[in-house]
Amino acid sequence: MSELIKSQESQSYRLAAQTRTNKKVKSLAERKDRAWYIARCATTLLKEDYGVKRVVLIGSLASGKGFHQRSDIDLVVWGLDEKKYYQAVGRLLGLNPEFEIDLIEAENAPPNILIVIEREGISL
């Protein structure tokens, strides 16, 4: 009898663990979808309001590797007026408080970062 109870308890624990895992996976997938949406909104804002010529997404959102509940959005831009950098960052952060957005000016990026951008980045 105790063997049957242990088996039922074990099955119950496994089912609960699987349910939690499924919820986490779904939650992460939904967060990733929201991050992509915000990245596209940020691209539109940067191009229309700040005259940015090109926007490339890099990092875990672009690669799909290592994206997690605290991942941010990494955008590289070409053609942003240096005097408007902080204003643009402020506007981007106001798009959605759930995400931090790192804005990298390609003109000031080190050469090794530019190689990564060209190899792994996604143009938006």
Locations of regions flagged by a protein language model:
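Catalytic core of pol beta-like nucleotidyltransferases
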Residues: 1-53, 63-69, 80-124
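Glycine-rich beta-strand-to-loop/alpha-helix junction loops that act as flexible
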Residues: 57-60
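Short hydrophobic/aromatic beta-strand micro-patches
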Residues: 76-78
